[in-house]
Curated annotation (Swiss-Prot):
The keyword Transcription does not apply. GO terms for cellular component: cytoplasm. Pfam families: Jacalin. GO terms for biological process: defense response. Self-interacts. Interacts with RTM3. It comes from Arabidopsis thaliana (Mouse-ear cress). It is found in: Cytoplasm. Residues 1-152 form the Jacalin-type lectin domain. Its main location: cytoplasm. Unable to mediate restriction of long-distance movement of the pathogenic tobacco etch virus (TEV) without causing a hypersensitive response or inducing systemic acquired resistance. SMART domains: Jacalin. One of its GO terms (molecular function) is carbohydrate binding. This is Inactive protein RESTRICTED TEV MOVEMENT 1.
Amino acid sequence: MKIGPVGKHDARSTTIVNWDEGSHDGFISQIFLSHGVAGIMSIQFQFVMDGKLVLSDRHGPFSGNMFDVIELNYPHEYITGISGEYYKYEANNPHMRSLKFNTNTSEYGPFGTSGSSNDKFAFKLGKSPQFGGFHGTYDASGLQYIGVYLRPKTVLPKIDTGNAEETE
């Protein structure tokens, strides 16, 4: 199930690139973020697929003055939510301003910058490991849009339908 994306882009930009990391049948073990005072510049992922580490393409320019690596404790830790802010006005550089990642055990961030000219978003994916990946767009100024994939549960929980025995 595709959720989002949220964000804004510069209508004058001619180099918007769509990206999609939701087709993998793997789990994210690391997230790499380049960011600065203007917001989130790029995002990249490392997946565990078939017992091997696979690095995604970098989505956005590597131009922020700060860089962070989020290391998830695979296979015990998984993403349960993402939230952040994006610039709400049409202008130069209206890209993703901040991101925060929630897992079943921790919270990472916020990374980037916060401000009163930003709109906020939050995707809460529940307590189960239902996260299926990210998608979005970027251009030369940074990450423009971001969204997530949710893998809905496919197995019903067991319900005890047995009747209690009566005692005399």
